[in-house]
Amino acid sequence: MRLRHERARLSALVALAALVSAGQAVTLRAHGTEARRVVSLTWKRDHITRVLDANRSELGLNGSKAPAQMMTIGGQACLFGDLFAFDVDDRYAFDVDEPVDVTVTYAPDRTQPFAIAWDKNGGDGYGISKEISPEPGATLRKATVRLERARFAGLGILNTDLAVGARGGIALCDISIVRSAATKAAAPRGRVQIEVKDAETGELVPARLGLYDATGRTPLPSDQALLIHRYADETRLLWVAPRLLWPSAERQAFYVNGTYETQVPAGSYEVVATKGPEYRVFKGAVDVKAGQLARVAIPLQRFINQPSRGWYSGDTHLHLMREQTQDVAVWGQVAAEDVHVGNLLEMGNIVTTHYRQPAWGRAGRYLRDGHLIASGQEDPRTTERGHTIHHNLQKPIHLPPEDFFSYHKVFEASHMQGGVSGYAHMAQIFNGRRGLSLDAPFGLVDFIEVLQGGRLGVDNWYPYLNLGFKISPAAGSDYPYFGPSLPGVERYYVKLDGPFDPDAWYSSFKAGHAFVTNGPLLDFTINGRGMGEEIHVARGAQLQIAAAARLNPDIDAMGRLDLIVQGDVAVTERASGGDRIELRKELTADHSMWIAVRATGNREVPAQGQLQELGAIAHSAPIYVVVDDQPFWKTPAVAELVRGEHQILQDLLTAPVDPMGDLEAWETVSVLAPQWERQRYLLRSRVQQADAKYDDILRRATARSSSAQARLGSAGLVVVAAFALAIVRGRDRRRRC
């Protein structure tokens, strides 16, 4: 049954791909691109103007990649699918604040437990009902859910108001909406005028704002708030996810470019403003009287001025389409989060490209007031080999479908253009470790995105450092995915010796002069040399290590600062109060090694291995200590690491294809799977070359350790050599298969 169900879903996806190519999906909107699966359905119901079959609701419920089906059950026209979004007729209810009853008619034998999500006043700005278990015993059943503080202001996907979803599907046969008409009459209005300035310079600055009445409701922003692009949505009001810096229990916010004015009902309001981790949070209040103007001056105080210290932040991963290079709204959103380099990525799959950029190279850069937006690409990207990112390109690089899995060709072309290239989501998903395992030994990978979604994925980074590869850390929000997030929630800082310059910034990042963070700010030197640098010393030389971490107390209190030597915690300093920790240590350089530092906040979050370290966290790029010109391998671990890389490459060649694994499977399903079956066999020679490079590292590491093993006795040497030989012979046998 399960296989038949999967085949049916796959057939439906192929059919949907044909519909999309025929132009029957929801059309794209200005400044956005519809990278979600969204199909408009004809299913008329009272007080409903539009019904969408979608894979996201933007109200807290998500669906799947499979399209909905129409069917007749009990004489009624029913929809079967995972998620449906509904646009409530504005003439019936718009921007209300009252309980609303929603009654759903469903077919129990075709319905899994389901929930209803809605556009809500206060709190997160959306509500999700308790899961409703289908009640068997009849062809059709009804369930009524009361939506508390329903708003219906079009804040869901493509300006919808509520959604019904079930993992595994719901057969939805009717839906009715009944207002309680309890919304209070609007109070007389006054005006509020807000100015946001940098307290040091007195200059107006972009910022993220919140404005909340006594009930937690935020008035819909005026057109002076920045118009934000979220996929193909255009909105001014955004949800601030719990892991994002925000000091209020009310978690809806908007962006302003220094000034903001609007009309609001008379009353008392809470005012909140933030501008990234280098600024203290502002919280204040304003009383608005009917017919009068209330002014609010917000002086944002610096916690620290990183640019004055030579550090400039970036977000490696933003999906924001521009129609022109000088897009003030896109720039404003990035600048409001105080991100100095916002990398706007086209997002390609084997069929098409989303989030198109208007120009490339210097022509694609918009630099204003020290904040830059620039074109880049996330392409190629597949579930089979992972997602790749390429910055600072002079022109986009898109492989044809018949060569789409030859990622190395894009890396090589990027480097020829002066680009900086790496792998995305390495704390997350999409099998990026397979692609990294294949491309790293050829020296193609400049960075990996180790911090994203609140997670630090060192499990996919440390092994390559321990095998002697210099790979820089990067961090990116992947806006509007992951939450949704907001730009700069995870960011990386790059060190410059002079004034901010985009070319120098990308060069310094490629050289590894960087750290990643979602809050803590790092300093780290060895013998006066900084992150990403290489220090050559003689055996026995003394290493003077100095490190420090600071954390804006509005984010969290400082917790600890760890000194990491080849993946192991060598020294820990714990906070004793205040917003700063210092670590000073002297080590003896008895072998080559890489050394880094990691800082965390005080809030304890359960961890599941190194992948799941959540909370405030930062990690530096390594400093590479080279003793007597020897590689900085973690020699005792090399044999096991090489064996692991061989297995990963074997998985790349043999793992079964997941036709629905691609993020936009509705677009790619008819092309990607057959192309992968053809092309992965063409990768065998590339895999064999990578295997040979790993084997060479193993041979050299074994030879290097022979003298040390001899001191342990000849038996120890024989065991190590035999282990290494067994791995190599195993590789040779596999090559002959």
Where are these regions (language model features)?
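Glycan-recognition and processing domains
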Residues: 28-93, 122
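Solvent-exposed strand-to-loop "edge" motifs in beta-rich extracellular domains
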Residues: 105-110, 550
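Extracellular carbohydrate recognition and processing domains
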Residues: 123-155
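Extracellular beta-strand ligand-recognition surfaces/modules
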Residues: 142-175, 317
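Beta-strand-rich domain onsets/edges
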Residues: 178-191, 197-202
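C-terminal functional module detector
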Residues: 197-262, 268-306, 467-473, 477-707
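Catalytic cores of extracellular degradative/oxidative enzymes
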Residues: 255, 282, 306-484, 502-504, ...
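A cross-kingdom C-terminal cell-surface attachment/processing module
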Residues: 714-731
